[in-house]
């Protein structure tokens, strides 16, 4: 099929080969536009070899906006993507919560490790709790860096060093304090989760659910049982037996 070169409608997806005088077809890829004149040469229209399947993903085109968005300014994260400022801020707050909880537990460890208190099982339990919350803080710090946020450490509040209680005794009082602390930590974690949901950050919600919430519920259940048992034994000889169960890791204490 031969077409004159005066005026053409626009064609897409076709290769056009100019026909020489001897009828030999030469490769040529052109766009035909309305009103454009191409001289006296004739063109043959034929389908290209590439199938017209419809392009749904053009990586070099679609990456342009992300490539241009990659910061070149020093101290600006290259990894950050879809990470809201509110999410970054609440993670820093939770880091502070975990470090404060660790600090309280470390003070409890020091108290029960004294020579005139000498409840080694309680000291062991509270030291392990302190280390666990510190690990939680460090995990949050690592996550913050992974998402391209910036870790900002807030001040840690002073904590008491004496935990004797006239009515309850130090063991029960300390364990009730631990229970309140775990419940408060859980509330703070739920707030972190809600902030992630509000900002449609699915990765962050999965991180908090998988790494913290289930473990926190288990901790609350365990310490609740400890409080119930200590309320039964009172302040006397039963506290020593309970301490020994904590020290040797006996199931149920």
Swiss-Prot record:
Amino-acid positions noted as binding Fe cation 2 in the UniProt annotation, renumbered to this chain: 182, 216
Chief localization: plastid
Stretches for region Extension peptide (EP): 48-80
Record GO biological process: intracellular iron ion homeostasis; iron ion transport
GO molecular function: ferric iron binding; ferrous iron binding; ferroxidase activity
Record: transit peptide: 1-47
Residues given in the record as Fe cation 1 binding sites: 98, 136
Iron keyword on record: yes
Bridged cysteine pairs (disulfide): none
Keywords assigned: Chloroplast, Iron, Iron storage, Metal-binding, Oxidoreductase, Plastid, Transit peptide
EC number assigned by the record: 1.16.3.1
Matching InterPro entries: Ferritin, Ferritin-like, Ferritin-like_diiron, Ferritin-like_SF, Ferritin_CS, Ferritin_DPS_dom
PROSITE patterns: FERRITIN_1, FERRITIN_2, FERRITIN_LIKE
Family: Belongs to the ferritin family.
Descriptive protein name: Ferritin-1, chloroplastic
Provenance organism: Pisum sativum (Garden pea)
Lineage summary: Eukaryota, Viridiplantae, Streptophyta, Embryophyta, Tracheophyta
């Amino acid at each position: 099929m031969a077409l004159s070169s005066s005026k053409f409608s626009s064609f897409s997806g076709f290769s056009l080969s100019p026909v020489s005088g001897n009828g030999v077809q030469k490769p040529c890829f052109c766009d035909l536009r309305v009103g454009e004149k191409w001289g006296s040469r004739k063109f043959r229209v034929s389908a290209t070899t590439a199938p017209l399947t419809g392009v749904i993903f053009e990586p070099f085109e679609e990456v342009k906006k992300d490539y241009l968005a990659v910061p070149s300014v020093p101290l600006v994260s290259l990894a950050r993507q879809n990470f809201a400022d509110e999410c970054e801020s609440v993670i820093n707050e939770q880091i502070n919560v975990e470090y404060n909880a660790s600090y309280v537990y470390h003070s409890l460890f020091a108290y029960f490790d004294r020579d005139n208190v000498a409840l080694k099982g309680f000291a062991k339990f509270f030291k392990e709790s302190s280390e666990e919350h510190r690990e939680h803080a460090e995990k949050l710090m690592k996550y913050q860096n992974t998402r391209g946020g910036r870790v900002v450490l807030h001040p840690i509040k002073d904590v008491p060093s004496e935990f004797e209680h006239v009515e309850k005794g130090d063991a029960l009082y300390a364990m009730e304090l631990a229970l309140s602390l775990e419940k408060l930590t859980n509330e703070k974690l739920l707030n972190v989760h809600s902030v992630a949901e509000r900002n449609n950050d699915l990765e962050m919600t999965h991180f908090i659910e998988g790494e913290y919430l289930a473990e926190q519920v288990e901790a609350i259940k365990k310490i609740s049982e400890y409080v119930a048992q200590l309320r039964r034994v009172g302040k006397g000889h039963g506290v020593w037996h309970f301490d020994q169960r904590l020290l040797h890791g006996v199931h149920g204490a």
